[in-house]
């Protein structure tokens, strides 16, 4: 199973990749939505772990562009937001 991790915080990006790799997944990593679009043009993924708040393009905008282009890859969102207004 091939997973794309899209997370701008370098330590969390590295930890996610290391953990998923240790579980036997093939993992690619990138740091924002714009970079993720480049990865998605060149490869197919079974799942995407996607941060909500990122520079250049946030996770919601990336997901919207993916769906508009017909990409139905399952997405797992990550966020540090925890208050009701943030939801």
Regions found by a protein language model. Name each.
Residues 1-87:
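N-terminal/domain-start alpha-helical segments
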């Amino acid at each position: 199973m091939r997973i794309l991790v899209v997370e701008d915080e370098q330590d969390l990006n590295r930890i996610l990749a290391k953990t998923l790799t240790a579980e036997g997944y093939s993992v690619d990593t990138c740091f924002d939505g714009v970079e993720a679009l480049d990865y998605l043009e060149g490869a197919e993924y079974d799942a995407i772990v996607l941060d909500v708040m990122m520079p250049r393009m946030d996770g919601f905008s990336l997901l919207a562009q993916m769906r508009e282009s017909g990409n139905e890859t399952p997405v797992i969102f990550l966020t540090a937001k925890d208050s009701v207004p943030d939801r």
